[in-house]
Amino acid sequence: ELIEAVRLIKFLYQSNPPPKPEGTRQARRNRRRRWRERQRQIHSISERILSTYLGRSAEPVPLQLPPLERLTLDCNEDCGTSGTQGVGSPQILVESPTVLESGTKE
């Protein structure tokens, strides 16, 4: 069943090739706009097909988190830098009561 669903989704995506880069700027823009709209429709149809075949909802299961007053961010390495450094492994520390309790600076 899953292989059939994947084949069907693959066929849907193959039936909508990217637009040709010819014609006036306006014509190319319109073709890209229509192509993106068809891609969105194919994406939503694909989600419905997968949820039907797999028997589960497309909605993500909500993540269970501890109460907000017990959450802190671990900022050991390069917190002030921009870019993508340190993005790979965010850490959440639990049970640090003094960090979020008072809103005043010491």
From Swiss-Prot:
Keywords: AIDS, Host cytoplasm, Host nucleus, Host-virus interaction, Methylation, mRNA transport, Phosphoprotein, RNA-binding, Transport. It is found in: Host nucleus, Host nucleolus; Host cytoplasm. A motif (Nuclear localization signal and RNA-binding (RRE)) lies at residues 24-40. Residues 14-39, 82-106 are annotated as: Disordered. Residues 8-16 are annotated as: Homomultimerization. One of its GO terms (molecular function) is RNA binding. Pfam families: REV (PF00424). A motif (Nuclear export signal and binding to XPO1) lies at residues 63-74. One of its GO terms (biological process) is mRNA transport. The modification Phosphoserine is found at S82, S89. Escorts unspliced or incompletely spliced viral pre-mRNAs (late transcripts) out of the nucleus of infected cells. These pre-mRNAs carry a recognition sequence called Rev responsive element (RRE) located in the env gene, that is not present in fully spliced viral mRNAs (early transcripts). This function is essential since most viral proteins are translated from unspliced or partially spliced pre-mRNAs which cannot exit the nucleus by the pathway used by fully processed cellular mRNAs. Rev itself is translated from a fully spliced mRNA that readily exits the nucleus. HIV-1 lineages are divided in three main groups, M (for Major), O (for Outlier), and N (for New, or Non-M, Non-O). The vast majority of strains found worldwide belong to the group M. Group O seems to be endemic to and largely confined to Cameroon and neighboring countries in West Central Africa, where these viruses represent a small minority of HIV-1 strains. The group N is represented by a limited number of isolates from Cameroonian persons. The group M is further subdivided in 9 clades or subtypes (A to D, F to H, J and K). The RNA-binding motif binds to the RRE, a 240 bp stem-and-loop structure present in incompletely spliced viral pre-mRNAs. This region also contains the NLS which mediates nuclear localization via KPNB1 binding and, when the N-terminal sequence is present, nucleolar targeting. These overlapping functions prevent Rev bound to RRE from undesirable return to the nucleus. When Rev binds the RRE, the NLS becomes masked while the NES remains accessible. The leucine-rich NES mediates binding to human XPO1. Belongs to the HIV-1 REV protein family. Homomultimer; when bound to the RRE. Multimeric assembly is essential for activity and may involve XPO1. Binds to human KPNB1, XPO1, TNPO1, RANBP5 and IPO7. Interacts with the viral Integrase. Interacts with human KHDRBS1. Interacts with human NAP1; this interaction decreases Rev multimerization and stimulates its activity. Interacts with human DEAD-box helicases DDX3 and DDX24; these interactions may serve for viral RNA export to the cytoplasm and packaging, respectively. This is Protein Rev. It comes from Human immunodeficiency virus type 1 group M subtype B (isolate BH8). The gene is rev.
